[in-house]
Swiss-Prot record:
Enzyme type, top EC level: transferase
Alphabetical list of InterPro entries matching this protein: Aminotrans_V_dom (IPR000192), Aminotrans_V_PyrdxlP_BS (IPR020578), Cys_deSase_IscS (IPR010240), Cysteine_dSase (IPR016454), PyrdxlP-dep_Trfase (IPR015424), PyrdxlP-dep_Trfase_major (IPR015421), PyrdxlP-dep_Trfase_small (IPR015422)
Transit peptide segment: 1-17
Protein name: Cysteine desulfurase
Cited NCBIfam families: IscS (TIGR02006), PRK02948.1 (NF002806), PRK14012.1 (NF010611)
Lineage, top ranks: Eukaryota, Metazoa, Chordata, Craniata, Vertebrata
PTM annotation, UniProt: N-gluconoylated.
Positions that bind pyridoxal 5'-phosphate: A129, T130, Q237, S257, H259, T297
Amino acid sequence: MVGSVAGNMLLRAAWRRASLAATSLALGRSSVPTRGLRLRVVDHGPHSPVHSEAEAVLRPLYMDVQATTPLDPRVLDAMLPYLVNYYGNPHSRTHAYGWESEAAMERARQQVASLIGADPREIIFTSGATESNNIAIKGVARFYRSRKKHLVTTQTEHKCVLDSCRSLEAEGFRVTYLPVQKSGIIDLKELEAAIQPDTSLVSVMTVNNEIGVKQPIAEIGQICSSRKVYFHTDAAQAVGKIPLDVNDMKIDLMSISGHKLYGPKGVGAIYIRRRPRVRVEALQSGGGQERGMRSGTVPTPLVVGLGAACELAQQEMEYDHKRISKLAERLVQNIMKNLPDVVMNGDPKQHYPGCINLSFAYVEGESLLMALKDVALSSGSACTSASLEPSYVLRAIGTDEDLAHSSIRFGIGRFTTEEEVDYTAEKCIHHVKRLREMSPLWEMVQDGIDLKSIKWTQH
């Protein structure tokens, strides 16, 4: 029996060993591929939710990094002192405990700013990208509402952006939801035409969370700058994965999430330009922390973790991107070579390689997910995964409803291994073939029948 105290000590020791392993890997990253770091702790304590050793050890492979990434052990190492020893309130200015925490908070602010080419004073800590998106969209719209009552966004934004815009519509604002092309990329001419004299904000995400498409952010920033309209981008899926510079790209507001870049959950940031100054109306009242834009005590351990994750991303981005690109190519080629009628959703070139969305014709996506129970995958955004409706992102790019229902998102990240990619491809190929053999539609296609020519009737 392992008691809770001893279990916690074992957990911390295991993470420290993993951290040392990760550090040694980092030293040789130019030539040695990163191996997946797997931590499986079996706790047989009376309050443990795990009922057997098999359940604890035999966990699925993780291929859903768009939903969340594992915490990098080096990030945990940076956080631990502020969870145990340096627990002062960073806003307490009268003693050393507060000063220590404040210094750590400001260092984290510098680390986040450095990753995106910003001034540290332009970084505001939040609870995550959802809050950052709400502050950016509602904050700008409400501050300038006396003169400007119009916003522009796209139909494929994250749900929190779309819901924020719908909330503003209920307050009397007008919102233009731009369609996207079949590639998933917006038409820049349509964007220019959509901007009106009273447009206050354009919000376009950097990398789509479902299909991985990269929008032309620098070109959008140039258009917004020339029309004197503020430009916000939800960069939760892009920060730390692709190079971003808020000044070169003329970005006025940017949303950042900690748990999408191997940092902790519950923390994020928003970049708000100082020169020329972007004004936002605060969403919550309180002690006026974070320059009055986000009241509430800043959680020092979490922002330290976010800062450490950003610093690691800046150091290792190029290596990670090359490695993830090779693994993604290996996965797609393996599947496409062995399975007919597989469609890759979204633009194959303007695309972040770690997010792969494939549709398997004549297979129901939910059935395939259930069959692939030993691989953690998703059929779309984690924020809408409870819905059985086809993805609104896939509908927006013109995907047929049957293909939209058959889509699976594969996420490849920093700790994904070649063996995991090969195993996932092998299992996917096996189960797609098995499910197709059970499908009358697949049998009809094999017999040469054009399904689109059939007029289906209800009984």
